Amino acid sequence: MEVIADRLDDIVKQNIADEKFVDFVIHGLEHQCPAILRPLIRLFIDILLFVIVIYIFTVRLVSRNYQILLVLVALVITLTIFLLLYTIIVLD
């Protein structure tokens, strides 16, 4: 259990260091641009980081759970077809 706690502490420290580095890079990029564009650059970088995190999360989710996701997709398709046929029969 102590090994896991030590590993989690190392991960937290690495995340803090990574965040400081990213903030340093963003700060450098902001000061190369005119003052009027700085908020737009900051917004663009934040959106880019958000998209990267969502992409990584989605790839991990799909790669680890593709079987259950396929079952859920098949279930949704089956229920959709059933509801369409049911509404066609009821409306006639």
Curated annotation (Swiss-Prot):
Keywords, alphabetical: Early protein, Host cytoplasm, Host endoplasmic reticulum, Host membrane, Membrane, Transmembrane, Transmembrane helix, Virion
Parts of the chain that traverse the membrane: 39-59, 67-87
Topology within the bilayer: Multi-pass membrane protein
InterPro entries: Prot_L2
Matching Pfam families: Chordopox_L2
One GO location term (cellular component): membrane
Intracellular or extracellular location(s): Virion membrane; Host cytoplasm; Host endoplasmic reticulum membrane
Top-rank taxon, per record: Viruses
Family that this chain belongs to: Belongs to the orthopoxvirus OPG096 family.
Function description: Early protein involved in virion morphogenesis. Participates in the formation and elongation of crescent-shaped membrane precursors of immature virions in cytoplasmic factories.
Quaternary structure annotation from Swiss-Prot or TrEMBL: Interacts with OPG158.
Name used for this protein in its record: Protein OPG096
Originating species: Monkeypox virus
